[in-house]
């Protein structure tokens, strides 16, 4: 019966999407609707082909979707890093801004593609896959909703990634940082995200373990908060239901405040709380040590959840935002430093008694460096939120360096460690294909991050000082073009750092493939047992 319901639903979706494509008022909308229709048809065929298949045992963990998530995370990571290298060199060498396809490959189109690829494709797939793995293992229960809900979340997320990418390349964007998707794709994100919440929360509800492990607290907080942020920030009235354009519900300073309430907390919950859930599970597992202080992890959780949501106004210092709101954001940001470092200390001290593994285990080394970058970024962020510091750093490349030291160092490195941990276990292999390749990846990525971040710190501070330099009469000394020319050497260094990081990602992709293809198999027990 359920299969027939799915067939009817997919048929209706395909028909509506095909009709919408035929009535489209602009190219991005038409292409997106064609993609949705094709996805629905492919899903319909897949349901037809699998209708008679035996149902999987309810005593086994649902690891198929997690394996797919590992593959997707690796693939989209490479795509995101590759686009990053292209746009880094486009900034250094503007001639690389090609006008092919009506500007499809210039910086303005590729930049949102890059941010979405690394945050929502690479990071999003990593979070979905790891959350599904962790919640099943710590609950000793199969994923709620079975294969249907799990695969809907996974393939729905891939559809969002593909439609977003094509929309950006074709010029479809609403121009909001980290929220460039137009209204019709915003709805798709909300639907898939609610399904993700149901799968995760349902698994916790049917858990066999009485205790809810702290990693699940962080995962759940990130899922719930991102849903709220996404829906409120993207409230809009479409100009036409057959076009991408819409009118935002809020305007002016209210829209700016809502946008950076969303933008900062996309960092705070998507890129921090979610990945802290990853840290609290995979670091103890890889180190084979319990969390240093479980009480500290609880304090860390509640302090972070309360404070982070207030910090958004620090993005709007010296703007039309009321001074009280700006000051409130600054104060909350400075206070946020303390729980953030509590989490960093908890992660690092989990290795107590196992520090020798840093010499022998490059995966642990990667995780430890990621925690170090988390600590550095969560000190630098509150410092940059102070108005006096922000007057120098705002609108400069210092902010870019700060974001990327966190994204590449914290999010990237902990994700790499998670992928190296999961791959042999999910495919039932005796171990990774090559620890030497992991070590190569570690050093290439670390050197790449240092080159990138330090180049942006240097050029950002230089840029801020050049902007504010005045002569004896009070006139500006430097034209804007002078500041751009002065940044050229550091832009090249940034590009080189990006190339090294990309090479590390390619080495990882080969190592993971070789682990599955060339390593001997072992018994792979995916049976629901007391918390692992």
UniProtKB/Swiss-Prot annotation:
Its pathway is:
Energy metabolism; oxidative phosphorylation
Q: From the record, give the transmembrane residue ranges.
A: 1-21, 27-47, 69-89, 115-135, 143-163, 185-205, 212-232, 263-283, 296-316, 328-348, 366-386, 403-423, 442-462, 496-516
InterPro entries hit by this protein:
Cyt_c_oxase-like_su1_dom, Cyt_c_oxase-like_su1_sf, Cyt_C_Oxase_1, Cyt_c_Oxase_su1_BS, Cyt_c_oxidase_cbb3_su1
Q: What is its EC number?
A: 7.1.1.9
Q: What is its main location?
A: membrane
What cofactor does this protein call for? Cu(2+); heme b
Pfam families named among the record's database cross-references = COX1
Could you say which enzyme class this protein belongs to? Answer: translocase
Which amino acid positions bind Cu cation, per UniProt? Answer: 264, 314-315
Report membrane topology: Multi-pass membrane protein
Q: What does this protein do?
A: Cytochrome c oxidase is the component of the respiratory chain that catalyzes the reduction of oxygen to water. Subunits 1-3 form the functional core of the enzyme complex. Co I is the catalytic subunit of the enzyme. Electrons originating in cytochrome c are transferred via the copper A center of subunit 2 and heme a of subunit 1 to the bimetallic center formed by heme a3 and copper B. This cytochrome c oxidase shows proton pump activity across the membrane in addition to the electron transfer.
Task: Please identify the protein, giving its name as recorded.
Answer: Cytochrome c oxidase subunit 1
Protein species of origin:
Rhodobacter capsulatus (Rhodopseudomonas capsulata)
Species lineage: Bacteria, Pseudomonadati, Pseudomonadota, Alphaproteobacteria, Rhodobacterales
